[in-house]
């Protein structure tokens, strides 16, 4: 799934446990911002883990857009999560 600010790769696997890989470009911001976003993303994944049974997800964040507030950026990501979940329900 390709979006304006990130790419989300996903594939099915035999194990029931979902897995998440996160790649964030240094262009996203300094280490504090990248790690904060990575923690937020992992928490979002953890709370919705039951919806991703049998999937491997690889999230690749590109450069954070300067015109978007962080809250709006996260809102867009949440919308893409919902679209991904709709594909597998």
Task: Show where each model-derived region lies.
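Positively charged, solvent-exposed patches that mediate nucleic-acid binding
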Residues: 1-89
């Amino acid at each position: 799934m390709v979006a304006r600010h990130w790419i989300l790769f996903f594939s099915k696997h035999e194990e029931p446990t979902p897995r998440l890989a996160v790649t964030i470009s240094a262009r996203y911001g300094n280490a504090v911002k990248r790690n904060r976003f990575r923690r937020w993303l992992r928490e979002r994944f953890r709370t919705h883990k039951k919806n991703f049974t049998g999937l491997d997800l690889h999230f690749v964040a590109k450069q954070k857009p300067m015109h978007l507030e962080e809250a709006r950026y996260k809102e867009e990501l949440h919308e893409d999560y919902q679209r991904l979940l709709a594909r597998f329900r």
